[in-house]
């Protein structure tokens, strides 16, 4: 059988079969021994020439490429797993795979047909199997002998073995006959085998030797070197090897087409038909293939020349061959019809109309006219087996969906659907198809059940969609967190992809799904957080695009980062922290608006700052911008200078009262305000004010000025300007200034030369009063400057100026020398022989210290400098003490040095001395150094040496412990100091633990006064008690309560016995109590508290001022326990700052039992007065007790206030009982100490101080005493009878006196009730409240509002009244369109109005922010605020020169619009004032009320209205922005304010705002309102309505302009194809007429009608406005009908407002005549339909017609669930989900 091979396949040559006798005889003549010898020689030659063999293999490949395809050895198949008839082509031992070239080895084995087997079957058959499957012999003997020696050496050995009897049995891998060798008698292969030709050595290639046969097999000698072969497989089944007919293979890339008129697989013409017939009978057997032909493919069909393509002629050679379809030629030309019209002036319009008609005819050709036959696949009930088969078919991509769409198994829905898709691994697109099919049927079920009730249908559909979304969410959670299942990763990937596709196609409730994603991320555990981050990142853009989800997402990430970063196992979560840090950094740069949330930002700002990488300027810049935006929403409403001063003063007070000064504090203060000069002045005022006690403020100011000097601040000029403008009267203020300048001069940032020049320019110093101690600071400073730190020239200039003023320089130097000599003598330093001071008795160090305190700043600095030089110079080593640098350095010498420095107040020099003295090895001295640092922690922190000194002492502690010296005092002092040093909490805990261990093992210090003879001092009975305690300590670490109670009672009884004696044995029993406390500190403290309460109730006892300090110093009594006795309940122990002053009832009950013993007054004195030197305490213990006193004042202010209240009540009760003997508060010293204590407590809690001082009694002397005390707190120089009024209090109020004025004001207002009760019925006396209101009015008019800081603590009624008054006056000052401001106001008046508005705003800000959370709830947005906000927008729109485009908010106009516009350039100034001043002020005002969370309906309405105004302002500012007005920053503030407002807005109010804005298109508004646009929400259908008969009659006339004029058409309307067809606008299609106008003639139109057409256009415009209002009224009535009519084409969801229209024609589809093209019409339905009119002179015009069709738009509901790709099994013309008729679709020709 011969056939024409396919294209591209090489034709095989006929096989040559012959057997040569000489060859056989020659081959048989070879002996077996010769063959073996040749084989061995060949193997040796191969080993020696390996490189030559590689070249031979390359030659073999080149020769094999020339090998003919008809060879007996076809290439093996490349498929390694194919196994046909024992032939394993994947066997690596197959040498043919290695010998044949790659191009032949890679061919498909089925494409090579052997001549011996033309059926195309595989030629690899075994020896014993015949051609047709019958058993046959193995062939001739010669064939059995022809084989290779080894499979690995098939073509390399020339040896021929003649023994045919040693044939091994055939196996799969060990067969000697190659599997690809043909079974028939083969020809002589010597001429054809390239392998044999190459492998035969040259010595065997003789001329007379014929071509040899293939090599024979070697002898059956077992070869042990050959690797073992696997066992043979079982015998394969027989295969049909009969020949098969030749089939034409169609090219896969050839395009196919459908053969018309053929349904049975037959038909067609030419070779394509034959090819289709051949294809139908091919192996595929598909009936669908027979209906299609292959384009441009005409294979040889057996008969030569039966196709025109095979006939070569001149035409075919030149132009080629193509199948031309029969086309009927045109018999008539259009030239005669169009040529006349084209020659006219309107020829271009005519040509466009002609083309429009041609396009219309072309569009209607083949247009789809069949009705929609769409129907979703039905659901049927199937058995489980069939259902499983159907689902498996769905998972098989080879099975088309049309086959599966015949029926959907019932019951596959919701969870089952998703699980089956996951388990069957259904492709994603097919899984989505199944979900659509099921969802469509579910939704149609709702429509059938709820027919007639559209509301219930919509509600049911929404509920079903939400339930389906919940199923998807549960599915994702179940798959994601099933970590133990197999193929977990693949399942997770599948779930992610499926959910993402469902989300992308809108097959779920997107809002609910996004909310679930964010909520899950917020509440997830750390172990699940990475998975939720992955899910959130899939929908990253959609989440961040909306405020509703973006803010929550950012907050969740920050919260997780904060928690993990603070976790104790943070090292485990390092990868997660890195991921969160990267995400947060990306979010801050990409979407910073999501971090604008004041409440969240204040909480997580510091944590977020830690995740910023170093050097990333973009992220740091974004962080700073976000911080600034949040500060605008949480900081004070008024950032003017008074507010900045308050902030600075508040920050400065913290570093001297609450916590030590941090290193970054100066930089923080620098950023408080941009007015740096005002900042410096406020800092100097704070440093020199008498209302801030202590020395720490001087060093804090010095540290800050040093830092600011590096920022290019001229400190010298700032200080000189301050001294010139500030009048300092109090000596305390002057000393602080002199001290500060002295430190600045020592640091080198205050230039003395510039100061001297400044004095000279002012006239110098001529009056002696100028340099006296009470002289002005600017001149007295010259005498206070330390001379030892000045240069020689500066010193000479200073002395010259002072001499001119009469200052005695020599006397001053002599006094300094005398002070130093007395100090040398007191310290025991050697003096000169003739020194008279050293000959006398030395002064006590305390007396010298008092004189130093009274000396000038220059004298103090000189003495401190001399003492430092003495210590550093080693002069103390040669003193009589011989102590410095040795182990025996006495604490007395150190105490003397410390006393001098404390008197001189030179702590900067003292810090250097302490650093030097830390080299001492005496632990007592080191402990005293630690105590000194503890007492002045704030001072050394300001000097930035606190941590350094602590580190040195801590290292010295380890050295002392290693030396074995008693380190307990140093350990105790360091443990107490470590708790005060910032950042040393862990070290403090370790030191306290070491101290407890040390106390247990060494209960008595070696250096203690009772360490050696404590037991000997006790009596016998007391010694037994001590031994019992020692045994308990040695035996264990615990003690039962009964035993402790017994021992405690025994020790306390003995302690009370020696109480009044003042014996040293009090210390012994105190030590026993301390050792007893080690067993159970908690129970011991309870026993001690009970004993203190017992002591409080004793009628007769000794003073507690001697016993309590001793017990505290020993360690068995704590200061909080003593303060607990100031409460009625002893459980208040350790309550800390949570305690408040007692009520009047509780106070009276306590003092009734204590007024006789003065217990409360003594306890108060214990915390105020220093311990007497006559007590049993050592100097070191007294110093440490003073530290505890100072620490209690700072850490327990409220407990001290309770104590003060009880002491005053006790004092009042005693005076009421006429018990005036030895009242502690009657002493003047105690009153001064109480005044200083109150001065400190007022700065911490002014309200608590006022409540503590509200003690009223029958004795008027106490009231006067309290009033005088509060007056002295405010006015330090006030006399006995000084009275301060409310107006004076408000005038004295500033940033520094504010707490003291607050106390005075509260005390004055609290007496109002008693004043009213005591008033008689006579003339009415104004109350204190009325007086205060009048004083506030005067103060606000004078623009003095510094007192507003104390308003929040007033009574709620008073603050509410004041806030309302300030709010009303603030709103009246705002400009508006209804009440425009006068254009004639000058700038000074405008500035005054702005200042008043700022003052009123500051009052409201202070009241609202100071009232706490409850106050925020009371101060909410009210409608009047929104009205004024609207007025500002109206005025801004009125002043804008171009029309505003604030959608949804336009149309506003005020009564003052004309007045504002008539001012010329004045309205530009007003507009600038609004944008720069008034609008920012009002935004601050709204910010105060935006933090409230009001869930009520009126509150949501007000917030919604405010948001609408914000939206209008955002759009308005975008329009105003330009070179004249930069509104970007202001627009950003409004945007941030809107974000804060919308965060607390209810969901229904948000939807109403979106509806009012009519689908906002601005990106910022979409973000604010979280509006997610549905791309299918605004689709519209365009309907054409037929005109009435009267309308047709009105529009049937035509008119023409006068001859010679140019025809025109309606402006704004371009002629073109229209979708609306009028009744009389059909264009005739007849041709052949010679008149060009008759081709487009409109029958029935006359010239009169043309003239009336223009008039009709004007009437049409008037009627359109009426039709619009009617259509709006009818639209709501038609929605019900439209929803029912469009159920087959629509979807679910609410009907949106029309915004996008699908230009669709519905009327012409039902007219029955599609031959008439429609006339052009615009898309706007409000415009009139236009009609083309043909003029008699050849022109054309478009005129509006009343009879033309009117367009009406109705919403089109796009049903996403019905968008199925294969809805039915039968292909229809119009079976798509959306009706093709809506798009005027055409069929493909």
Swiss-Prot record:
Assembly information from the UniProt record: Component of the srb8-11 complex, which itself associates with the Mediator complex.
Similarity section: Belongs to the Mediator complex subunit 12 family.
InterPro entries assigned: Mediator_Med12 (IPR019035)
Compartment(s): Nucleus
Record field: compositional bias (Polar residues): 107-124
Broad class of where this protein is predominantly found: nucleus
Family matches, as Pfam families: ARM_SRB8, Med12
Stretches the record annotates as Disordered: 1-138, 156-288, 1592-1656, 1707-1727
Gene Ontology CC annotation, any one: mediator complex
Molecular function via GO: transcription coactivator activity
Biased composition (Basic and acidic residues): 220-229
Function as written in the Swiss-Prot or TrEMBL entry: Component of the srb8-11 complex. The srb8-11 complex is a regulatory module of the Mediator complex which is itself involved in regulation of basal and activated RNA polymerase II-dependent transcription. The srb8-11 complex may be involved in the transcriptional repression of a subset of genes regulated by Mediator. It may inhibit the association of the Mediator complex with RNA polymerase II to form the holoenzyme complex.
Keywords noted in UniProt: Activator, Nucleus, Repressor, Transcription, Transcription regulation
Keyword Ribonucleoprotein: no
UniProt organism field: Neurospora crassa (strain ATCC 24698 / 74-OR23-1A / CBS 708.71 / DSM 1257 / FGSC 987)
Lineage: Eukaryota, Fungi, Dikarya, Ascomycota, Pezizomycotina
A GO biological-process term: positive regulation of transcription by RNA polymerase II
Protein name as annotated: Mediator of RNA polymerase II transcription subunit 12
SMART domains in the record: Med12
Bias kind Low complexity: ranges: 25-66, 81-98, 271-288, 1592-1628, 1647-1656, 1707-1716
């Amino acid at each position: 059988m011969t056939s024409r091979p396919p294209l591209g396949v090489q034709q095989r040559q006929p096989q040559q079969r012959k057997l040569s006798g000489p060859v056989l005889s020659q081959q048989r003549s070879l002996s077996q021994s010769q063959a073996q010898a040749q084989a061995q020689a060949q193997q040796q030659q191969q080993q020696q020439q390996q490189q030559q063999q590689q070249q031979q293999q390359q030659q073999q490949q080149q020769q094999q490429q020339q090998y003919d395809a008809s060879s007996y050895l076809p290439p093996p198949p490349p498929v390694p797993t194919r196994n046909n008839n024992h032939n394993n082509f994947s066997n690596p031992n197959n040498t043919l795979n290695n010998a044949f070239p790659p191009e032949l080895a890679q061919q498909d084995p089925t494409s090579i047909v052997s001549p011996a087997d033309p059926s195309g079957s595989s030629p690899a058959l075994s020896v014993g199997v015949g051609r047709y499957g019958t058993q046959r012999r193995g062939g001739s003997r010669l064939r059995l002998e022809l084989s290779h020696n080894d499979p690995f050496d098939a073509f390399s050995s020339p040896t021929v073995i003649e023994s045919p009897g040693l044939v091994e049995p055939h196996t799969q891998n060990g067969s000697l006959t190659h599997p690809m060798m043909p079974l028939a008698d083969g020809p002589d292969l010597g001429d054809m085998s390239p392998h044999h030709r190459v492998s035969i050595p040259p010595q065997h290639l003789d001329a007379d030797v014929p071509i040899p046969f293939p090599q024979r097999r070697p002898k059956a000698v077992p070869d042990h070197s050959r690797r073992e072969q696997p066992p043979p497989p079982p015998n394969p089944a027989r295969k049909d090897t009969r020949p098969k007919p030749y089939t034409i293979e169609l090219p896969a890339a050839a395009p196919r087409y459908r053969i018309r008129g053929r349904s049975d697989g037959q038909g067609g013409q030419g070779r394509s038909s034959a090819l289709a017939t051949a294809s139908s009978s091919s192996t595929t057997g598909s009936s669908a293939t027979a209906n299609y032909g292959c384009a441009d493919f005409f294979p040889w069909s057996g008969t030569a020349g039966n196709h025109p393509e095979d006939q070569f002629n001149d035409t075919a050679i030149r132009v080629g061959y193509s199948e031309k379809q029969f086309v009927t030629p045109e018999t008539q030309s259009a030239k005669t019809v169009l040529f006349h019209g084209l020659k006219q002036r309107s020829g271009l319009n005519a040509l466009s109309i002609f083309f429009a008609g041609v396009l219309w005819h072309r569009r209607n050709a083949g247009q789809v006219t069949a009705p929609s036959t769409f129907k979703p696949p039905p659901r049927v009930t199937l058995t489980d087996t069939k259902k499983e088969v159907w689902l498996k078919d769905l998972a098989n991509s080879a099975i088309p969906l049309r086959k599966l769409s015949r029926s959907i198994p019932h019951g596959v829905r919701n969870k089952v659907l998703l699980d089956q898709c996951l388990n069957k691994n259904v492709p994603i697109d097919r899984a989505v198809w199944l979900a659509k099919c099921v969802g469509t049927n579910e939704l149609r079920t709702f429509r059938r059940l709820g027919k007639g009730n559209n509301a219930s249908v919509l509600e049911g559909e929404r509920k079903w969609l939400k339930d389906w979304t919940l199923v998807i969410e549960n599915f994702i959670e179940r798959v994601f967190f099933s970590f133990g299942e197999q193929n977990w990763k693949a399942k997770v990937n599948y779930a992610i992809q499926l959910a993402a596709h469902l989300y992308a196609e809108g097959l779920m409730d997107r809002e609910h799904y996004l909310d679930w994603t964010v909520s899950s991320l917020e509440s997830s555990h750390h172990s699940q957080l990475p998975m939720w981050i992955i899910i959130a990142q899939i929908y990253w853009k959609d989440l961040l695009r909306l405020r509703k989800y973006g803010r929550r997402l950012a907050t969740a990430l920050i919260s997780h980062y904060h928690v993990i970063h603070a976790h104790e196992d943070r090292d485990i979560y390092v990868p997660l922290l890195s991921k969160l840090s990267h995400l947060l950094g990306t979010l801050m740069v990409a979407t910073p608006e999501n971090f604008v949330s004041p409440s969240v930002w204040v909480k997580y700002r510091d944590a977020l700052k830690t995740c910023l990488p170093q050097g990333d300027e973009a992220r740091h810049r974004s962080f700073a911008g976000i911080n600034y935006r949040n500060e605008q929403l949480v900081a004070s409403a008024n950032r003017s200078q008074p507010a900045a001063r308050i902030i600075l003063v508040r920050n400065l007070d913290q570093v001297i009262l609450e916590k030590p000064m941090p290193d970054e504090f100066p930089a923080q203060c620098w950023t408080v305000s941009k007015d740096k000069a005002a900042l410096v002045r406020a800092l100097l005022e704070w440093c020199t004010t008498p209302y801030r006690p202590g020395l720490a403020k001087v060093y804090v100011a010095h540290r800050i000025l040093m830092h600011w000097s590096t920022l290019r601040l001229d400190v010298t000029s700032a200080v000189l300007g301050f001294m010139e403008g500030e009048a300092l009267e109090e000596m305390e203020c002057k000393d602080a200034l002199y001290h500060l300048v002295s430190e600045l001069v020592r640091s080198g940032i205050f230039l003395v030369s510039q100061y001297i020049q400044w004095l000279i320019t002012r006239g110098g110093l001529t009056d002696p009063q100028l340099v006296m101690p009470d002289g002005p600071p600017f001149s007295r400073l010259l005498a206070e400057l330390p001379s030892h730190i000045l240069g020689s020239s500066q010193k000479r200039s200073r002395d010259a100026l002072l001499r001119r003023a009469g200052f005695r320089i020599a006397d001053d130097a002599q006094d300094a020398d005398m002070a130093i000599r007395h100090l040398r003598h007191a310290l025991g330093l050697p003096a000169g022989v003739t020194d008279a001071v050293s000959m006398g008795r030395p002064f006590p160090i305390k007396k010298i210290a008092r004189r130093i305190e009274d000396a000038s700043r220059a004298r103090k600095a000189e003495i401190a400098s001399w003492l430092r030089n003495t210590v550093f110079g080693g002069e103390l080593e040669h003193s009589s003490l011989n102590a410095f640098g040795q182990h025996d350095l006495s604490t007395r010498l150190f105490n003397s040095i410390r006393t001098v420095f404390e008197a001189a107040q030179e702590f900067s020099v003292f810090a250097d001395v302490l650093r030097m003295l830390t080299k001492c090895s005496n632990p007592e001295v080191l402990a005293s150094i630690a105590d000194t640092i503890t007492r002045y922690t704030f001072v050394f922190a300001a000097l930035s040496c606190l941590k350094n000194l602590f580190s040195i002492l801590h290292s010295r502690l380890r050295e002392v412990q290693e030396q074995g010296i008693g380190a307990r005092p140093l350990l105790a002092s360091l443990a107490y100091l470590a708790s005060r040093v910032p950042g040393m909490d862990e070290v403090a805990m370790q030191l306290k633990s070491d101290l407890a261990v040390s106390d247990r093992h060494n209960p008595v210090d070696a250096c203690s006064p009772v360490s050696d003879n404590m037991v000997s001092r006790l009596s016998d009975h007391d010694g037994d008690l001590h031994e019992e305690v020692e045994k308990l300590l040695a035996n264990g670490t615990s003690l039962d309560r009964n035993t402790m109670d017994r021992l405690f009672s025994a020790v306390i009884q003995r302690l009370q016995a020696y109480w009044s004696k003042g014996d040293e044995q009090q210390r012994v029993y105190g030590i026993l109590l301390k050792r007893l406390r080690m067993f159970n500190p908690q129970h011991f403290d309870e026993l001690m508290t009970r004993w203190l309460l017992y002591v409080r109730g004793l009628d007769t006892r000794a003073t507690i001022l001697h016993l309590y300090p001793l017990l505290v110093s020993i360690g068995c009594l704590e200061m909080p326990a003593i303060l607990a006795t100031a409460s009625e309940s002893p459980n208040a122990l350790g309550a800390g700052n949570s305690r408040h002053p007692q009520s009047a009832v509780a106070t009276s009950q306590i003092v009734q039992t204590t007024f006789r013993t003065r217990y409360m007054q003594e306890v108060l004195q214990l915390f105020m007065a220093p311990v007497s030197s006559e007590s049993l305490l050592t100097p070191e213990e007294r110093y440490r007790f003073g530290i505890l006193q100072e620490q209690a004042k700072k850490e327990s202010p409220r407990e001290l206030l309770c104590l003060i209240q009880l002491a005053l009540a006790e004092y009042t009760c005693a005076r009421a009982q006429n018990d005036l003997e030895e009242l502690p508060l009657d002493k003047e010293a105690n009153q001064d100490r109480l005044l200083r204590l109150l001065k400190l407590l007022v700065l911490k809690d002014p309200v608590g101080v006022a409540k503590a001082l509200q003690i009223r009694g029958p004795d008027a002397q106490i009231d006067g005493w309290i009033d005088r005390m509060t007056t002295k707190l405010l006015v330090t120089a006030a006399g006995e009878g000084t009275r301060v009024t409310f107006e004076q209090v408000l005038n004295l109020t500033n940033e520094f006196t504010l707490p003291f004025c607050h106390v005075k004001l509260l005390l004055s207002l609290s007496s109002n009730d008693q004043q009213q009760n005591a008033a008689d019925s006579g003339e009415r006396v104004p109350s204190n409240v009325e007086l205060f209101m009048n004083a506030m009015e005067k103060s606000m008019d004078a623009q003095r509002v510094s007192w507003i800081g104390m308003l929040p603590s007033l009574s709620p009624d008073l603050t509410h009244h004041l806030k309302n008054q300030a709010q009303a006056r603030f709103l009246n000052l705002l400009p508006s369109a209804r009440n425009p401001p006068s254009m004639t106001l000058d700038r000074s008046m405008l500035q005054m109005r702005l200042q008043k508005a700022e003052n009123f705003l500051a009052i409201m800000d202070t009241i609202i922010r100071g009232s706490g959370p409850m106050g925020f709830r009371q101060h909410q947005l009210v409608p009047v605020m929104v009205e004024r906000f609207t007025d500002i927008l109206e005025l801004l729109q009125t002043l804008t020169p171009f029309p505003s485009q604030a959608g949804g908010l336009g149309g506003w106009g005020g009564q003052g619009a004309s007045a504002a516009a008539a001012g010329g350039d004045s309205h530009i100034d007003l507009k600038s004032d609004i944008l720069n001043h008034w609008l920012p002020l009002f935004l601050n005002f709204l910010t105060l009320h935006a933090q409230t969370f009001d869930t009520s309906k009126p509150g949501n309405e007000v917030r919604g209205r405010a948001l609408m105004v914000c939206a209008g302002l955002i759009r308005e500012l975008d329009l105003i922005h330009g070179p004249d007005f930069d509104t970007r920053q202001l627009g950003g503030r409004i945007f941030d304010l809107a974000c804060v407002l919308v965060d607390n807005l209810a969901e229904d109010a948000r939807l109403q705002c979106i509806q009012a804005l009519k689908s906002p298109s601005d990106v910022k508004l979409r973000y604010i309102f979280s509006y997610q646009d549905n791309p299918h929400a605004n689709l519209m259908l365009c309907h054409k309505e037929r005109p009435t008969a009267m309308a047709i009659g009105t529009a049937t006339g035509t008119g023409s302009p006068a001859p010679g004029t140019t025809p025109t058409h309606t402006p704004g309307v371009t002629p073109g194809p229209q979708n609306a067809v009028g009744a009389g606008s059909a264009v005739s299609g007849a041709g052949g007429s010679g008149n060009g106008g008759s081709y487009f003639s409109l029958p029935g139109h006359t010239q009169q009608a043309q003239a009336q057409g223009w008039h009709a256009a004007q009437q049409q415009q008037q009627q359109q406005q009426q039709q619009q209002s009617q259509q709006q009224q009818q639209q709501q009535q038609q929605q019900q009908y439209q929803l029912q009519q469009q159920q087959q084409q629509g979807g679910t969801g609410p009907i949106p407002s029309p915004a996008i229209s699908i230009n669709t024609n519905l009327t012409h589809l039902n007219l029955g005549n599609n031959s008439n093209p429609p006339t052009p019409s615009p898309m706007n339905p409000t415009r009139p339909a236009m009609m083309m009119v043909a003029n008699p002179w050849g022109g054309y015009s478009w005129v509006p017609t009343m009879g033309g069709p009117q367009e009406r738009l109705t919403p089109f509901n796009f049903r996403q669930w019905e968008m199925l790709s294969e809805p039915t099994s039968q292909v229809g013309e119009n079976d798509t989900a959306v009706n093709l008729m809506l798009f005027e679709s055409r069929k493909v020709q």
